Amino acid sequence: MADLSGIVKAYDIRGVVGEQIDAPLVREFGAAFALLIKPDSPRVVIGHDMRDSSPGLAAAFADGVTSQGLDVVLIGLASTDELYFASGSMNLPGAMFTASHNPAKYNGIKLCRAGASPVGQDTGLAELRATVEDGVPAFSGQPGTVTEQDVLTDYAAYLRNLVDLSGGRRLKIVVDAGNGMGGHTVPTVFGMSAASRSDSGEGGGERRAGLPFDIVPMYFELDGNFPNHEANPLDPANIVDLQAKVREVGADAGVAFDGDADRCFVVDERGEPVSPSAITALVAVRELAKEPGSTIIHNLITSHGVPEIVKEHGGKPVRTRVGHSFIKAEMATTGAIFGGEHSAHYYFRDFWRADTGMLAAMHVLAALGEQDRPLSELTAEYSRYAASGEINSTVDDQIARLMAVKDSFGTRPGVTFDEMDGLTVQLPDGGWFNLRPSNTEPLLRLNVEAADAAAVKALTDEVLAIVRG
């Protein structure tokens, strides 16, 4: 078997279909996963997104699992957080076939243990890779069986039990599904009729009985070729249509989902982006109101405003490395009720510590509807500093460039460092930046925060001059 290091990433398995990933290889991964989880579970739940290659790859994985004597529950088309719901509610390990926001030629597998517990490099992925590279041992016993189960309705009902959407003022909300799985889950969560799900371009939308929302749908047709734009709302180019539609129809807010709908991105009534850090703080405050004094997780790239706001509301902020496996592990250790990342991943204890963009979006809409101010004014409470967003630089030697930055700033009075994840530099005027290597590409990722936009630009320019010099 060829070296699989190119497709086994830090948190999932991902590559170009037909070149790096195909059905025979995926079958081997299914068999290896069955061996990994066999001591703990007799069944595996499998879902897939709308990519052309996903149903076939999911079937191949299921064949590999059953070849080792374990049973399979197929839930069919699903968002990643819907798969996590199935894993959590059934207490089964799971496999989700998706490449998230990557282009159509890609596909991959997100894996979890029972209860939606993460599988990453240190919690099973490295072992899976080794098993497949060495050759999966044959199983001589009876093969497992395959059953099908639709969990979409139960998933929607579970989310609506966590956030009450029925009591607020009536809102008009534009939702851009990006031709991804949000087009599958949003209609059921919000109870939209079949007729209202088409992208008519009209401003009327659909109001669900008991829910005060007019939903204006954009790009709800499931299409893994992403004909309208990439399903990555963190790229500003991919929310231009959403911003324009919000302004056109006079909506109260806009929500965009990525390809597998585990992340959400929000724009306000002006069409202006709301930072994921502000969403993290807003949801944290809502969760702390229910359970005062609880722990909130934030990764080291989220705004410093997040831990400040958490403390002001009686919570305990805990800072972690970037990545879902670190967030989920820290939530388990601390008993945290909620966690947020700069990348618009939001994690909830009551959702098996898994990330769900849908639940975060529901919190934002509930908060908006419970008061009379526009979203821009509501979220201004949670936005304290200016930020650069993530800036990538291609470099020949990541470590050498990191050390050059550290050496430059290390001579300055009052500057402090930490290396929890890459290099974080804290300046005496309150500005700070993080510079960290990509796990999969020859990139350094820079995030800068400071008091205002001018200070952010000056600090960004200074760091990039060293990184790219």
Language-model features, listed with the residues they occupy:
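N-terminal small/polar loop signature for handling phosphorylated ligands or for N-terminal nucleophile
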Residues: 43-107, 189-193, 210-267
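Short glycine-rich phosphate-binding loop at a beta-alpha junction
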Residues: 41-49, 172-174, 294-300, 337
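Gly/Ser/Thr-enriched, mixed-charge loops and adjacent short helices
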Residues: 107-193, 210-249
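Phosphate-binding and adjacent anionic-ligand microenvironments
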Residues: 253, 289-469
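Active-site nucleophile and cofactor-binding loops and adjacent substrate-binding regions
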Residues: 72-81, 273-276, 298-299, 320-321
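An N-terminal, well-structured beta->alpha segment
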Residues: 1-61, 67-68, 148-171
